[in-house]
């Protein structure tokens, strides 16, 4: 494959095993729903996207089931520019474990040499399997909104952008990844400026992603 983009960014998919993130990953990669077999290690694909008249290359990484065994190794998180944090809107455990995944993201980034967890890459929250009708056991919109508010109140991220998707019906796949791609580029450019300006104490970097989208 011929790479035309000068900037190569990394986007990672995180969330519980069987949360639906691999189905979303495969749908965005153009693979047919339900027939793809995961490899034994991390799965990835490359895509070049035009962002504001700039061609940017993106390496998308999925865990491919590795999260079943233990926490992911720090290599998976190294040089990530944005995270896609997924949960199954019908699965209580996958929703409760969202905090665990954010904690792991921050800890692995610190292990990889990031100076502060406040400099961790931004994330977009995706609720999967929206094609399945909600029941009393499903995660309510009110609980999701409260989780987003708690994250914002803790200043983990300025604003949580949330989307509900269905890989089976190809519903709401492109829009979140358009936002994710822009967040990744913003983060990459900010970190590049920070690295070039270590001696400038007035430089501030944050996860303030003021891009219009569905949000909590």
From Swiss-Prot:
Transmembrane segments: none annotated. Disulfide bonds: none annotated. GO terms for cellular component: late endosome; lysosome; phagocytic vesicle; plasma membrane. Keywords: Cell membrane, GTP-binding, Lipoprotein, Membrane, Nucleotide-binding, Prenylation. GO terms for molecular function: GTP binding; GTPase activity. It comes from the Eukaryota. InterPro entries: P-loop_NTPase (IPR027417), Small_GTP-bd (IPR005225), Small_GTPase (IPR001806). Its main location: membrane. NCBIfam families: small_GTP. Belongs to the small GTPase superfamily. Rab family. This is Ras-related protein RabN1. The gene is rabN1.
């Amino acid at each position: 494959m011929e790479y035309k983009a000068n900037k190569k960014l990394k986007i990672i998919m995180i969330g519980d095993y069987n949360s639906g993130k691999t189905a979303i990953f495969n749908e965005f990669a153009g693979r047919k729903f339900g027939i793809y077999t995961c490899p034994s290690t991390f799965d990835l694909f490359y895509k070049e996207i035009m962002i504001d008249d700039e061609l940017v290359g993106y390496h998308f990484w999925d865990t491919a089931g590795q999260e079943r065994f233990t926490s992911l190794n720090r290599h998976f998180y190294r040089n990530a520019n944005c995270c896609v944090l997924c949960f199954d809107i019908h699965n209580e455990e996958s929703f409760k474990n969202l905090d665990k995944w954010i904690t792991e993201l921050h800890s692995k980034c610190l292990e990889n040499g990031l100076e502060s967890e406040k400099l961790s890459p931004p994330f977009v929250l995706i609720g999967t399997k929206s094609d399945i009708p909600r029941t009393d056991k499903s995660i309510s919109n009110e609980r999701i909104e409260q989780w987003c508010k708690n994250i914002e109140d803790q200043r983990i991220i300025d604003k949580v952008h949330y989307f509900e998707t269905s890989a089976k019906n190809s519903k709401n796949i492109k829009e979140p990844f358009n936002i994710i791609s822009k967040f990744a580029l913003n983060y990459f450019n900010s970190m590049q400026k920070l690295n070039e300006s270590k001696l400038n104490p007035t430089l501030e970097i944050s996860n303030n992603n003021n891009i219009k989208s569905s949000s909590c």
